[in-house]
């Protein structure tokens, strides 16, 4: 049988607060000073319509930490033997589980798993394995870890199709063979003949897909990696060409919606190899994680930063994670998508500085932290995965963005976003800041100016997280970086009059809202526009993660511009974010906040109000609902905590 592994198939406020905030505006961005205007709360506001899956996983911020078999299977081009799987789990439990890497996940090379349940669901990773999924889920649980599974619920194994006794779960009248079209094999045009693609138009198809997802959930699997989605949608690979029959956009969206529904709040859905057509709308609506670059492959600097730099309208849109994270950063953030930069193979890099850059990038972008080195490969490189201060950024939910220079998409203008300078705000108001040198030859100095780039006119206390050293109060984070080197800092601004400011330019954007800087007078590097009426099925919104010590009615300020004819109203919704299903309830609202009209779009004012926040982590969403009027640009929100 031809080995069609996933890797071989791929070729390669207060008045005082307001006065302070406006007083800090630089002369180059002078704005008309406007006195604070009270917000007018109306408790009858309907909820916002969402474009995203908005699961407990994405609302929590950054991706999970786990280990994957890829470091064994890619070099061997073979499924991992069960004894090697066990040895790596034991190594993981002894060395990394205490650092939060608590999932062991399979990967490709899956065609050799042909033993199925009576409903056609595979019972183990490979036929050569003695033990089934349940055994390994229990083995991991005994070590306070969990089982992650790589499999696509749209696959139907040939062995199940050819067994007339196999029927669809809950549909004994439908045989597994009835779910496929003869010859519609995954990778058919390049030799695939073991896995069929499911025909989602067939009776029983929905039950099969959702039964597959629930089958894994019942085994205690919290994380499902679903691969080769582009090949299902249109049957094409950007490097290979036609690989199998296309199944169409409508069927693709339908299949993803079934998976989303079945996964619910109990399973994290990782979408791998999607084309991300229509700006990733289908993936946003139905997934938690989405792959944004080519496979880790042999690892090393070339896979991290080299290879193709330009965009293509097919998976992978960008080849390396620096560009992929940057290009898709408008889709990241709480309640939106977790961008997945694929696996980390520290042992494949040429220097410790490159290894730190690998880790810094994944953490800054909010990616999952997926170790793919094995116990035999790791050598003396485990340290890069276990820096507690760096990992704390991930634990706090850091999802950074590159510095934006304009609203032009990165796919159209690679100069519109800076791949080497990243920042993201944490719920307590502190920041994670990362600087990179992607040059192969030049030592360069990289800087983020806190006032100009982040809107922090007061500066902040800077701590170097690899040096474990406080650098003191400063107006910037800066580092002289050798080729391939990087630095990552935690920046803690002082609280002024008890307030904490959250810039919209570093929040999560949805429903058509996005970055802009085409009007002067804003604080920081820009603002969010698009908070206006639209023709789509989702409302534009901005979401901020906010940490408070106790439940309280919290004075709030919203710096905005509004030159429409109407007094603009925009919903403010406060939600409690917690990775527990029962804790998804609304804390306050939705309520309306009034944004009175101003002279021009270059005039900025602050609307004042009060919202209730709960103790712990809250998600505060400002959105333009269907019953609202007018439009605003939003610069920041400020909370008196």
Curated annotation (Swiss-Prot):
Subcellular location: Secreted
One Gene Ontology cellular component annotation held by this UniProt entry: extracellular region
Changes after translation: Predicted to be exported by the Tat system. The position of the signal peptide cleavage has been experimentally proven.
Chief site of localization: secreted
Active-site residue numbers: 227 (nucleophile), 288 (proton donor)
Record bears the keyword Secreted: yes
Span of domain CBM6: 500-640
Protein name: Isomalto-dextranase
Alphabetized InterPro entries for the sequence: Aldolase_TIM, CBM6, Galactose-bd-like_sf, Glyco_hydro_27, Glyco_hydro_27/36_CS, Glyco_hydro_b, Glycoside_hydrolase_SF, Melibiase_C
Region of interest (Disordered), ranges: 556-588
One BP term from GO: carbohydrate metabolic process
Keywords in alphabetical order: Glycosidase, Hydrolase, Secreted, Signal
Compositional bias ranges of the Basic and acidic residues kind: 577-586
């Amino acid at each position: 049988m031809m080995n069609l592994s996933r890797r071989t198939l791929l070729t390669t406020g207060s008045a005082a607060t307001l006065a302070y905030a406006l007083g800090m505006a630089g002369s180059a961005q002078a704005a008309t000073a406007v006195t604070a205007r009270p917000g007018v709360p109306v408790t009858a506001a309907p909820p916002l319509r969402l474009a995203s899956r908005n699961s407990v996983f994405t609302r929590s911020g950054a991706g999970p930490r786990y280990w994957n078999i890829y470091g064994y299977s890619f070099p061997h081009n073979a499924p991992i033997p069960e004894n090697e799987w066990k040895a790596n789990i034991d190594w993981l439990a002894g060395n990394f589980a205490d650092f939060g890497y608590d999932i062991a996940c399979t990967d490709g090379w899956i065609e050799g798993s042909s033993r199925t349940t009576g409903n056609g669901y595979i019972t183990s990773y490979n036929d050569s394995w003695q033990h089934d999924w349940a055994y390994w889920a229990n083995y991991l649980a005994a070590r306070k870890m969990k089982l992650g599974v790589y499999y696509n619920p749209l696959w139907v194994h040939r062995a199940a199709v050819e067994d007339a006794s196999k029927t669809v779960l809950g549909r004994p009248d439908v045989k597994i063979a009835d779910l496929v079209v003869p010859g519609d094999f995954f990778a058919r045009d390049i030799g695939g003949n073991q896995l069929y693609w499911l025909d989602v138009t067939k009776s029983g198809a929905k039950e099969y897909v959702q039964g597959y997802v629930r089958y894994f959930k019942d085994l205690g699997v919290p994380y499902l990696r679903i691969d080769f989605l582009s090949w299902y949608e249109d049957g094409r690979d950007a490097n290979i060409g036609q690989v199998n029959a296309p199944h169409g956009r409508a069927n693709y969206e339908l299949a993803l919606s079934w998976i989303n529904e079945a996964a619910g709040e109990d399973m994290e859905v990782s979408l791998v190899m999607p084309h991300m057509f229509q700006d990733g709308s289908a993936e946003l609506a139905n997934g938690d994680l989405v792959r944004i670059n080519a496979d880790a492959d042999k690892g090393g600097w070339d896979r991290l930063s080299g290879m193709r730099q330009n965009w293509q309208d097919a998976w992978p849109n960008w080849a390396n994670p620096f560009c992929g994270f940057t290009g898709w950063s408008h889709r990241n953030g709480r309640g939106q998508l977790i961008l997945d930069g694929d696996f980390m193979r520290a042992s494949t890099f040429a220097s410790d500085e490159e290894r730190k850059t690998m880790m810094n990038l994944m953490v800054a972008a909010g990616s999952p932290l997926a170790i793919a080195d094995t116990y035999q490969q790791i050598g003396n490189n485990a340290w890069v995965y276990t820096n507690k201060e760096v990992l704390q950024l991930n634990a706090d939910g850091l999802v950074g963005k590159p510095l934006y220079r304009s609203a032009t998409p990165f796919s159209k203008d690679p100069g519109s976003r800076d791949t080497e300078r990243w920042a993201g705000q944490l719920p307590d108001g502190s920041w994670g800041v990362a600087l990179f040198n992607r040059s192969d030859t030049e030592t360069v100095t990289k800087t983020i100016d806190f006032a100009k780039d982040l809107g922090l006119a007061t500066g902040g206390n800077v701590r170097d997280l690899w040096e474990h050293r406080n650098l003191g109060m400063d107006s910037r984070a800066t580092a002289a970086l050798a080729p391939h080197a990087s630095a990552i800092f935690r920046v803690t601004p002082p609280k002024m009059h008890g307030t904490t400011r959250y810039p919209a330019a570093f929040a999560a954007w949805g429903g058509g809202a996005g970055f802009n800087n085409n009007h002067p007078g804003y604080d920081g590097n820009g603002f969010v526009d698009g908070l206006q009426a639209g023709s789509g099925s989702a409302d534009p919104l901005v979401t901020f993660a906010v940490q408070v010590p106790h439940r309280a009615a919290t004075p709030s300020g919203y710096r905005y511009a509004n030159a429409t004819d109407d007094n603009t109203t925009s919903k403010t919704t406060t939600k409690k974010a917690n990775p527990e299903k029962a804790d998804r309830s609304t804390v306050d609202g939705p309520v309306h906040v009034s944004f009175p009209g101003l002279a021009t779009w270059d005039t900025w004012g602050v609307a004042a109000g009060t919202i209730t926040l709960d103790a712990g982590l809250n998600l505060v969403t400002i959105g333009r609902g269907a019953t609202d009027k007018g439009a605003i640009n939003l610069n920041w929100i400020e909370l008196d905590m």
